[in-house]
Amino acid sequence: MIELRRAVPEDLDCLFEAANSAFAGSTVSGKGPRWKRSREFLGDCLAEQECWCILLDGRTVGGLILFPQPDCLWLEGAFVEAGHQGEGIGQQALGELLRRYPEATWRLKTPAADKRDCHFYEKLGFARTGTEAGHGGQEFALYEKKIF
């Protein structure tokens, strides 16, 4: 059974391990999100932003990182450890988080070359609104979902 729980500082190690597992096999150029590469940055996210643990049978298997902004909720990250990808866990967890904010505009960006990520967000009703150039020429797809 999937459960979504607000993360606390003591969750840092299990979230960091899940993030590294989730992005270990990425075929997209680059080294992954900065919170995947830096335990310190992920710790700052836990202290200053809204982070959620995705639990499967009581064990953390993923996470969601949300940066509330004045005009939107910015989804900085969604990840499920490699051993549980493709099971619908991320879709269930993000769907639950979306339901917790019934009147909001959600935004995110993901590598445009990562077709699996793009498909994941589109399945959840996010609309592609454009692209943005990143470091090293990597292109990011911009997404938005309005819930009212």
Describe the function of each predicted region:
Residues 2-17:
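A short beta-loop-alpha structural element at the N-terminal edge
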